[in-house]
Amino acid sequence: WSDPKLMNYGFKTSDMKHFGTAPGIGIVIQTGKYQGRILVPLYYNSNSFSGMSGAVLYSDDNGATWHLGESPNDARAAAGLSKIGMGEIQIVEMPPEGDDVSTQLKMFVRQSGGVLIATSYDGGQTWAPDMPRDPTLVAPTPYGGCQQSVINYSHPIDGKPAVIFANAAANSRSNGTIRIGLINENGTNSEGRINYTFDWKYKKVIRSGEF
């Protein structure tokens, strides 16, 4: 390994206060226009907005150079919408729509009481302003929610691509639950892109001494 390189100075602006990587994992985009892009989720706040915003650092040259993508809150501000306090984030990849099309990404956002989901159509460089709350993915209200994990599963389940999500599914940091979400196609948007939704079909509560 080479010596580690402190990257804050290249991306942390003078307005930013906290600037840190989100717990969990980064991903490498597997399909589509941005295949091979490395994504590292992070979150930050600033003097102009005390709540957290989520974004990704991305690299298209195996980590030689990095770029800071925008946050869904940037899109919300541009659209005249209020920014939303975002906690730690994780990213998963949706099924491919074609080699020359950027594969959609979903950002799972930690927030008090539940999980928000944002969508990127350009490999994480920008995000749509909408961050709907998934009603199934409950989370603690205190502490601004709780750390969560979500990954793409390596094989289809019930014939569909799937993700695995884990968090404290209660109003407190308890009831640790793993869920399997089947990825469904739910029509298309105004630009002809597929609307992907999750069917949280299976779950398992983690209990001490058993699984």
Regions found by a protein language model. Give the residues of each.
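Asp-box/BNR beta-propeller blade signature and adjacent active/binding-site loops
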Residues: 1-211
